[in-house]
Amino acid sequence: MSGTKLEDSPPCRNWSSASELNETQEPFLNPTDYDDEEFLRYLWREYLHPKEYEWVLIAGYIIVFVVALIGNVLVCVAVWKNHHMRTVTNYFIVNLSLADVLVTITCLPATLVVDITETWFFGQSLCKVIPYLQTVSVSVSVLTLSCIALDRWYAICHPLMFKSTAKRARNSIVIIWIVSCIIMIPQAIVMECSTVFPGLANKTTLFTVCDERWGGEIYPKMYHICFFLVTYMAPLCLMVLAYLQIFRKLWCRQIPGTSSVVQRKWKPLQPVSQPRGPGQPTKSRMSAVAAEIKQIRARRKTARMLMIVLLVFAICYLPISILNVLKRVFGMFAHTEDRETVYAWFTFSHWLVYANSAANPIIYNFLSGKFREEFKAAFSCCCLGVHHRQEDRLTRGRTSTESRKSLTTQISNFDNISKLSEQVVLTSISTLPAANGAGPLQNW
């Protein structure tokens, strides 16, 4: 928006404060200089009506909303419909998709509205609920990614220490949601609605903001430092360490029955196929080596996909995490003159957070053959369903037309047969031989 940005962050994550506007607003943004109607018209023209570049932002949010919603729902349906896809890793992926669906439905629309209109239109209750759900979904996503990394680390690096099962995965998912709901309760407690212009509170809801209200200056700093460490930095460091060990295990290891160490190069692994001589592996040993190579290939694909998911998550959440710490902890952007740039940074970082929810299904589609097949099957069913409905209409139309034509033909044939029958009867009567020279009618 042109002019001063009333709230640099969306309500869901509450990444900036609107209370500082009174210190930085432009001189002409003073309601006492105008009558109420004129001032409200000015607000609509300068702040509420989307500018040209904000239409691009709206289009970007719509694309993310559609892709994130459809993609993550398809992920859940694919695992639910196919028993062979109900693995430990896929259970966690479904949980990640559920968190993405939650944040897409509940928080994305509110974020877009506030970023464009600079106003919280949704009341006091949703001012507490929506930010709470946002932080819960962030916590669920981070803890789920951490559980995936931990599960892969145990399965690949220490397979004998811990055995993952579907039941344990489901129990872990329940614990993740319970822990996330508990630790994010402070976010719901501190959120409050307020208005920038109290004199207009009875006339309009414009410039009502949903922001944190703390009892002192030290508490928000402590909270946001802990939030940054718990939901971003600490889990990210642990996951990076886990995947580094997984990488070393899968790409730099000695395969029994092969002649050399598997290098970091991503070359396809081939079992030894020379003729067996003294000391050469037996056929059963070769089969075991081939099975192990096949398992390593599958684990490489899975690890590669999960590493990319983690990398995309880190990139998408990095800008808003840094901006949040700079603003909440160090008090930056409170007296900046270039608020348009600050607004652009915050707005883009908000969009990146939601784009992460849309990116995950795309990653699964490109890097997982099973998910790709299920996505294709789902779209094929939709397309075939439309095609079948069109064919049914055409078939019914053809059947109706053919029925009418058949009925007309039958009636026409019946008339022709009737006429032919009459002609045959009359002809047969007229050609009877005359008796005693009498005419044909004399026999009656």
Swiss-Prot record:
GO terms for molecular function: neuropeptide receptor activity; orexin receptor activity; peptide hormone binding. The keyword RNA-binding does not apply. Residues 1-20 are annotated as: Disordered. Residues 1-10 have a biased composition (Basic and acidic residues). The chain crosses the membrane at residues 55-75, 89-110, 128-150, 171-191, 223-243, 305-326, 343-366. One of its GO terms (cellular component) is synapse. The record marks W44 as: Important for responses to orexin. Pfam families: 7tm_1, Orexin_rec2. Residues 1-54, 111-127, 192-222, 327-342 are extracellular. Residues 33-49 are annotated as: Required for response to orexin-A. The keyword Disulfide bond applies. It is found in: Cell membrane. Residues 76-88, 151-170, 244-304, 367-444 are cytoplasmic. GO terms for biological process: cellular response to hormone stimulus; chemical synaptic transmission; circadian sleep/wake cycle process; feeding behavior; locomotion; neuropeptide signaling pathway; phospholipase C-activating G protein-coupled receptor signaling pathway; regulation of circadian sleep/wake cycle, wakefulness. Disulfide bonds join C127-C210. It is a multi-pass membrane protein. InterPro entries: GPCR_Rhodpsn, GPCR_Rhodpsn_7TM, Orexin_rcpt, Orexin_rcpt_2. It comes from the Eukaryota. Suvorexant binds at N324. PANTHER family: G PROTEIN-COUPLED RECEPTOR 15-LIKE, LEUCOKININ RECEPTOR-RELATED. Nonselective, high-affinity receptor for both orexin-A and orexin-B neuropeptides. Triggers an increase in cytoplasmic Ca(2+) levels in response to orexin-A binding. The N-terminal region is required for orexin signaling. This is Orexin receptor type 2. The gene is HCRTR2.
